[in-house]
Amino acid sequence: SSDGLHFVAAPSILGPSYFRVFLYAGWHYALVMPGSVHRSVDGIADFITGPTLFEPAMRHSAVRVVGDWLEVYWTRVGGNRGRIYRSMVDLCSDWMDWSVSDPTEILRPERDWEGAAEPLAPSLRGAANELVNQLRDPCILEDDGRTFLFYASGGESGIGLAELFG
């Protein structure tokens, strides 16, 4: 896009859906749902599939490189899991040997607009067309030395924003 408003799709298909790209050590990597890693020299073509780091229940993710670590903010399907988790990946080893840390819960519905008053129910793949007790779709924004996490609240009923520290 020349103006950030109008886009023309390139003919090549980069990879599966929910393709979260990050740069590290001269390579373009992508974390895709449900948790496999792909890489490419130029980030435009020839992404090859590498290891699967996450469980099949991984839904959406957001990624951020901090030094030699990849921070992954992610959600799950199934169970009563409408929460956002954070896991870390040490990027120092060969990418085919990467592994993910155990998840740490960082956010769950706390307010009515986030679905906190709704009953706990299994999170399903696909759209949530009514208010549910779930957070989804994390997205990271770094601006002026601050880091923010956007997320869909109440399933897909609103958008929340939290500042990340540390």
Where are the regions a protein language model picked out?
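Carbohydrate-active catalytic/glycan-binding domains of CAZyme proteins
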Residues: 1-166
